[in-house]
Each structure stands twice: as C-alpha cells, then as structure tokens.
Regions:
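Short edge beta-strands and adjacent beta->alpha junctions
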Residues: 1-116
C-alpha cells in the first residue's frame, strides 16, 4: 500500500474534472494509475470520497469497470457534507468511476493508498 495522500478530484475547483457539480445520473472517470505515486500495475485504491452540498437526497457510487453496481458508497441528504473511506477497483485503463444518483453535488476524492 504505497502513495497517498493525494487529491485526485475536486469538482469545486476543477481538479481533474470541470469546476462544476456532478448532475443527476452523471458519472466521472478519474485517472488513478500513474498519478500521485500509484503504480501503473495497481488493481485497486483506497480513496477518501466526499460529497458536499447536494441539491437533493442522493448517493455516490465508486466503481471500476463495467456497469454501475447495485451498491452505493455514500448516502447524502440535501445540503450536507459526508465522507467515506472506500477500496475501489481500477478498470483496465487505471481509472475509477464515481456516479451521482440524484440532484447535483460536488465530489472530492483523496487518494490514501493502493493495492496490487
């Protein structure tokens, strides 16, 4: 488990994504392998995932490849800020994907380490 801490994403300020909120049904693809000390061969990462200021009750789901899984990582009520530590698999190109269900929300992802 190397690397970290490193800010991978912050939609409030345009870090690795446009400086705008993630809309309902929106999914961000975030490059991780080779970033912030993560080796290109990493298979998963430990990420501190934060949602802040949602306009509706929502949930964030972080995942690797394939279709959206049926589980969520972080539940948020309107206007609140919450954080969760999650192990997220990387897709074959070294990305993680973060999906917002409802309303719009700012998303922050801080890398804490990697596996594999």
């Amino acid at each position: 488990m190397g690397a970290g801490p490193y800010r991978l994403l912050d939609t409030r300020y345009g870090i690795d994504a446009p400086a705008k909120r993630v809309g309902a049904g929106g999914t961000l693809a975030v490059k991780v392998a080779g970033i912030g000390g993560i080796p290109l061969g990493a298979t998963s990462v430990l990420v501190n995932l934060t949602g802040t200021g949602p306009t509706a009750t929502t949930h964030l789901t972080a995942f690797g490849a394939g279709s959206l899984p049926g589980v969520m990582n972080l539940n948020l009520a309107t206007g609140e800020t919450r954080t969760v530590l999650a192990v997220i698999p990387l897709d074959s190109n070294g990305y993680i994907h973060i999906h917002n269900a409802n309303g719009s929300v700012n998303v922050i992802a801080d890398l804490e380490g990697s596996f594999g």
